[in-house]
UniProtKB/Swiss-Prot annotation:
It is an enzyme of class 6 (ligase). This is UDP-N-acetylmuramoylalanine--D-glutamate ligase. Disulfide bonds: none annotated. Transmembrane segments: none annotated. It is found in: Cytoplasm. Pathway: Cell wall biogenesis; peptidoglycan biosynthesis. GO terms for cellular component: cytoplasm. It comes from Aliivibrio fischeri (strain MJ11). ATP binds at residues 115-121. Its EC number is 6.3.2.9. The gene is murD. Keywords: ATP-binding, Cell cycle, Cell division, Cell shape, Cell wall biogenesis/degradation, Cytoplasm, Ligase, Nucleotide-binding, Peptidoglycan synthesis. It catalyses: UDP-N-acetyl-alpha-D-muramoyl-L-alanine + D-glutamate + ATP = UDP-N-acetyl-alpha-D-muramoyl-L-alanyl-D-glutamate + ADP + phosphate + H(+). Coiled coil: none annotated. Cell wall formation. Catalyzes the addition of glutamate to the nucleotide precursor UDP-N-acetylmuramoyl-L-alanine (UMA).
Length: 440
């Protein structure tokens, strides 16, 4: 089934921003649908925004609703392997996510991005470049606006960030172009292993006209024959060339702009810029109209963002680094004059933090480890200190700061042990940075 034909009873599992967008979308359908919402939280966010004709069951599951539904729409945070969904699956009830509903409804070109790291930056950058070329563009999915809310914008192009969780429940999304940026260990508390995680990511290519893959990460290549374009740091479809000692971003070995002109810093952002170029090229957007955006784009909040710079001490908010690979990328691009004071920790999601050791060894640093899994970092480097909270860590490091030092939050962990999300964690760090910068 692809659509609402024959559907009368719909159960939405999980409220919040995504769940509310699903409810609003269902209410807009011409079919007379009975909509019910299940949320295991006692007071789920958005409960007060539900219309009276949408019944809510909170504080647990409601099996009768699930097994009598014609269609179940789950929040990305709900795994299909959840035992509470098994009776409905055994009964043959279709379970989809919000992106599948988006696929049924969208009537303009869509491009999408997935990967373990960098997908938010690539999604936002691609959207900004398309807008600069005069294309009415809507950006969202796993970033910013929920995908279904974007449909109200009547865009000419949709640019979506898609997580592996969203892709699990997406089957019919047709894409003009799709990019799989990279694959590194993440969400091992959800998946049986890396192969399982990779298969979820690869679903982005199922109905893509052009598949954009990473030449430096063969795990991003589809297992079946597809139309491929690749990006990387060598020459290729989209890559880098050197002329007169200057590195350039290039398409088919033809230079587009110098790497040192990019508004974003760090080697990983050269790759991110190449992906954005490849995606827009795939949908026929004139690249000349987009290159100025690459020169001026400074990135997203909570991603290697300098939030304070006072007395020669920089405070960098990289709260979006919720896994080891993200923190490694942040460390690889650093320009340090003094010592790095690195804040790590939170919920490790079963990750192997030992991959950080070589990068830490090469840096002049002190590492402050906090949160639920902070103790797992201490053994990585003798220059480590265990703290209960980020506040305690900053209070401890502050008296030791000298001109040229950098304080960086790049936790390599999820935030939900002490914060609502990575944004709240980043905001808390930013507040601390500004507070201590004033005092210094």
């Amino acid at each position: 089934m692809s659509g609402f034909g024959g559907v009368k009873n719909v159960v939405v599992v999980g409220l919040g921003m995504t769940g509310l967008s699903v409810v609003k979308h269902l209410l807009r359908q011409p079919e007379a649908l009975t909509i019910k919402v299940i949320d295991t939280r006692d007071t789920p966010p958005g409960h007060d925004q539900l219309p009276e004709n949408v019944e809510l069951h909170s504080g647990g599951w409601q099996q009768d609703w699930l097994i009598n539904a014609d269609l179940i729409v789950t929040n990305p945070g709900i795994a299909l392997a959840s035992p509470q969904l098994k009776p409905a699956i055994d009964k043959g009830i279709q379970i989809v996510g919000d992106i599948e509903l988006f696929a049924w409804a969208v009537n303009a070109p869509v491009i999408a991005i997935t990967g373990s790291n960098g997908k938010s930056t690539v999604t936002d950058l691609t959207g900004e470049m398309a807008k600069a070329a005069g294309v009415k563009t809507a950006v969202g999915g796993n970033i910013g606006f929920a995908a279904l809310d974007l449909l109200e914008q009547d865009a000419e192009l949709y640019v979506l960030e898609l997580s592996s969780f969203q892709l699990e429940t997406t089957s019919t999304l047709k894409l003009k172009a799709a990019a799989f940026l990279n694959l590194s260990e993440d969400h091992m508390d959800r998946y049986q292993g890396m192969a399982d995680y990779r298969q979820a990511k690869l679903r982005i290519f199922d109905h893509a006209e052009v598949c954009i893959v990473n030449r430096d990460d063969k795990q991003t290549y589809p297992d079946v024959e597809k139309t491929l374009k690749s990006f990387g740091f060598d020459q290729g479809d989209y890559g880098c060339i050197e002329k007169d000692g200057i590195e350039y971003l290039a398409k088919d070995a033809m230079s587009l702009l110098a790497a040192n002109e990019l508004g974003l810093v760090g080697k990983h952002n050269i790759a991110n810029s190449l992906v954005a170029i490849a995606l827009l090229d795939a949908v026929g957007i004139n690249l000349d109209a987009t290159l100025d955006t690459l020169r001026t784009y400074n990135g997203l909040t909570h991603r290697c963002q300098v939030v304070a710079d006072n007395n020669g001490i920089r405070w960098v908010n990289d709260s979006k680094a919720t896994n080891v690979a993200s923190t490694l990328a942040a460390l690889s691009g650093l320009q340090l004059e003094g010592k790095l004071h690195l804040l790590v920790g939170g919920v490790g999601k079963g990750a192997d933090f030992s991959e950080l050791s070589p990068a830490l060894h090469d840096l002049n640093l002190m590492m402050y480890c906090f949160g639920e899994d902070g103790d797992q970092f201490v053994s990585l480097d003798p220059r480590s200190l265990l703290c209960e909270t980020m506040d305690e860590a900053v209070a401890t490091l502050y008296p030791t700061l000298n001109k040229g030092d950098m304080v960086m939050l790049s936790p390599a962990c999820a935030s939900f042990d002490q914060y609502a999300n990575f944004m709240a964690r980043g905001d808390a760090f930013t507040q601390l940075a500004k507070q201590y910068s004033i005092e210094s």
